[in-house]
């Protein structure tokens, strides 16, 4: 991935984290990599564990970043979340949800989609 694109992705992820922290969520871990998938942000929201996918598109002609979270991507996120919970059994009993932070435009405008999809939808 080109350096400028990597920097943009890191900046959008940091902005998404700040947005969620302002809303009261607390970071558990960022950029957790597992075979077949990556979890951008894992956060606590009260008693719930939240797996957050951050998606950026400079141009939203074909839909914003959230439009790119198709069934294949959702399935990868669910698998990565299962692997995360297997590695962190103390968190496995918590209720979980999947959120998406959609970033589009220049400068990026963020939209938080709470409970964007459910694991059993995949």
From Swiss-Prot:
One of its GO terms (molecular function) is nucleic acid binding. It holds the Pfam family UPF0102. InterPro entries: Restrct_endonuc-II-like (IPR011335), tRNA_endonuc-like_dom_sf (IPR011856), UPF0102_YraN-like (IPR003509). Belongs to the UPF0102 family. NCBIfam families: PRK12497.1-3 (NF009150), YraN family protein (TIGR00252). This is UPF0102 protein XAC0764. It comes from Xanthomonas axonopodis pv. citri (strain 306).
């Amino acid at each position: 991935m080109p350096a400028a694109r990597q920097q943009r992705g890191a900046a959008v992820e940091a902005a998404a984290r700040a947005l969620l922290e302002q809303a009261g969520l607390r970071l558990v871990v960022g950029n957790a990599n597992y075979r077949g998938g990556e979890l951008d942000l894992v956060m606590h929201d009260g008693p719930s564990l939240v797996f957050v996918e951050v998606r950026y598109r400079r141009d939203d002609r074909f839909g914003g970043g959230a439009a790119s979270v198709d069934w294949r991507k959702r399935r990868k996120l669910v698998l990565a979340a299962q692997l995360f919970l297997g590695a962190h059994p103390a968190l496995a009993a918590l209720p979980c949800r999947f959120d998406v932070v959609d970033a589009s435009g220049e400068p990026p405008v963020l939209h938080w989609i709470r409970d964007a999809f459910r694991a059993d939808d995949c």
